Amino acid sequence: MKPSIIKILTALFLLASIPGCKKNYIINDEQALYFQFDYVNHAWGYQHSGFIIDNEGSVLTYNNPENWNFPDKDLILSEKDVEENLSKCTPGPVAVTNDELKKYTGYIRHIASSKVTALKNIGADAGTAQFICWQYSPHIGEYKGYLIKMEGDYTCENLNFYSKRVVSWMKDIHGNLDQF
């Protein structure tokens, strides 16, 4: 081969190996938020309630918080927005064990890489409950949410095998909160 062709091929190889500016959402120790159950209803008066599971396994509840930071259409929240939301939560009467938290956070990467069914309108006035898991990108200070399941006026669900397990687990937590 000619030296110029070798130089061109080498340059192309080097350019191809440079990583792009992809947002790298991961699970890490800096992440404050892992899971969220969020219920909103605009019928018969505004209702907004739910709970968050944080990095310590605490179940933090909220009920009609003022100035809540909702994620955008792509389920993105800034680190500042998450911190503000967490400050509006109250520690709940239940918590998640470290083993349980490790088990369920291990499912997030699978859920994040799966598709969600099409949104269906099946009712009115029931409101909408969303089960969401979160990944964090420390380099840009953003949280990316992944819809696990939506119930109520509108329904859809993540097609990943682990989704049903996570939803069942979160419903158990929600049921335990209702007992207090």
Model-found features: residue ranges?
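Surface-exposed acidic loop/strand-edge motifs in secreted or periplasmic proteins
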Residues: 45, 52-123
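Bacterial N-terminal signal peptides that target proteins for export
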Residues: 1-9
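C-terminal motif of bacterial Sec signal peptides marking the signal peptidase cleavage site
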Residues: 17-20
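Short, well-ordered, aromatic-rich surface patches in folded extracellular/luminal domains
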Residues: 23-43, 49, 110-180
